[in-house]
């Protein structure tokens, strides 16, 4: 019988094992969480996303962004996983990680100052009027890969579909819905 266990045989000849001492806990390095620091950093990262949203709202020309607040801003880790988001329009966030992952996968040579835009529903977009802008962030000038990403997704009134508003009810192909941006390099610094 293993240490910490006791074995006994019942009247019906069943073998019963009982733990008599608690199991030794092994913890991996860095897995202990300080709840206070977790909350501090959670609020810090959420505040960054909220400030991104304020900048977007204050500089936007679109009524959908400026007044309807139909946008979302978030931070993502180096693999495209969501770190924090502001409480703007939650529906945008469900697939935004996939947009980030598309940019990461298709741009191994991205550089500081690059900004990408996409709205492709096949690569993490929701629908064509929701345009996502992705910016890789480098913490050091000599970093080869981004440390994390920031992204914003905003709804635009018209993206050039066959009907005003870019959401034709009788479209049979995505081409009828408007312009599709898929991993387009918008800015190279």
Regions found by a protein language model. Give the residues of each.
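Regulatory sensory and allosteric helical modules in signal-transduction proteins
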Residues: 81-85, 97, 101-120
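A short, hydrophobic, proline-anchored segment that marks a local hinge/packing element in signaling
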Residues: 132-141, 151
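Conserved SET/PR-domain catalytic core that frames the SAM/AdoMet-binding pocket
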Residues: 2-7, 79
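Terminal amphipathic helices with adjacent charged low-complexity linkers/tails
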Residues: 7-28
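Mobile "lid/hinge" segments at catalytic clefts and subdomain interfaces of large enzymes
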Residues: 145-189
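A short, polar/charged loop-to-alpha-helix boundary motif
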Residues: 90-103, 157-166
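Long, charge-dense accessory insertions within large macromolecular proteins
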Residues: 20-24, 30-92, 97-100
């Amino acid at each position: 019988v293993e240490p910490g266990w006791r074995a006994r045989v019942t009247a019906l000849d069943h073998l019963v094992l009982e733990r008599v001492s608690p199991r030794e806990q092994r913890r991996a390095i860095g897995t202990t969480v300080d709840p206070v620091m977790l909350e501090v950093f959670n609020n810090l990262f959420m505040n960054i996303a909220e400030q991104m949203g304020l900048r977007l709202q204050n500089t936007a020309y679109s009524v959908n962004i400026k007044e309807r607040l139909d946008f979302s801003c978030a931070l993502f880790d180096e693999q495209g996983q969501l770190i924090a988001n502001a409480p703007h329009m939650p529906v945008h966030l469900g697939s935004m990680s996939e947009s980030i992952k598309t940019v990461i996968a298709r741009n191994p040579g991205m550089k500081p100052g690059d900004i990408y835009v996409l709205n492709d529903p096949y690569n993490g977009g929701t629908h064509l009027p929701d345009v996502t802008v992705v910016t890789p962030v480098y913490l050091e000038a000599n970093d080869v890969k981004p440390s994390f990403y920031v992204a914003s997704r905003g709804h635009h009134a018209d993206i050039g579909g066959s009907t005003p508003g870019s959401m034709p009810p009788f479209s049979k192909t995505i081409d009828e819905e408007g312009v599709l941006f898929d991993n387009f390099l918008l800015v190279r610094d």
